[in-house]
């Protein structure tokens, strides 16, 4: 199995191509079972964050961004004020799932900023923009993790050249399942494999 094939199997958070649901790995079943679940409702998304079905700050942020985009796509009507009012209710509801999750609030606030910065646009365009913003959040996380990996791999190569013993010690949730891809502390190993 190549590194890319591995990543395809363990993408923690992704939106289904048809945008009908948020697709996550249910991390409460790990390590014994890798099971993907689809989240369609505000209750399912809230519960997945609350019950740690999705774990790791970056992964929670991506789940929140995709979750609010999915929920906003179902808001009826084409009047901005009514749309924004309902968006805020949904945002606040998702935010209540994990009161200490910094990336949860960061992602939801960023999504809200995208809505308010585009209030002159029609609601359909704003809904599309929210999916694009969620994609950006996920892609930025991938690039951050990759950057960590490249720097870390460079340091590991230097240690190896010096003949020093190499070890990687992680704490908390620092692997690929905590992020959109690569992980944080584990990223240098994946970059090395690439």
Language-model features: locations:
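Positively charged, low-complexity intrinsically disordered leader regions
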Residues: 1-43, 47
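N-terminal active-site beta-alpha-beta segment that forms phosphate/nucleotide-binding
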Residues: 53-63, 67-194
């Amino acid at each position: 199995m190549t590194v890319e094939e591995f990543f395809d199997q363990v993408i923690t958070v992704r939106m289904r191509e048809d945008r009908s649901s948020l697709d996550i790995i249910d991390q409460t079943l790990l390590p014994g079972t890798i099971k993907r679940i689809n989240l369609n409702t505000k209750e399912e998304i809230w519960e997945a964050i609350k019950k740690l079905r999705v774990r790791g700050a970056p992964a929670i942020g991506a789940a929140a961004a995709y979750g609010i985009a999915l929920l906003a796509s179902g808001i009826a009507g084409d009047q901005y004020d009514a749309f924004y009012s309902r968006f805020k209710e949904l945002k606040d509801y998702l935010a209540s799932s994990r009161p200490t999750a910094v990336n949860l609030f960061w992602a939801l606030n960023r999504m809200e900023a995208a809505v308010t910065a585009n209030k002159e646009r029609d609601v359909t365009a704003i809904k599309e923009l929210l999916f694009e913003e969620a994609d950006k959040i996920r892609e930025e996380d991938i690039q951050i993790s990759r950057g960590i990996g490249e720097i870390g791999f460079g340091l590991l190569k230097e240690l190896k050249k010096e003949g020093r013993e190499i070890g990687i010690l992680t704490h908390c949730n620092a692997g690929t399942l905590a992020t959109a891809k690569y992980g944080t502390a584990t990223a240098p190993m994946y970059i090395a494999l690439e």
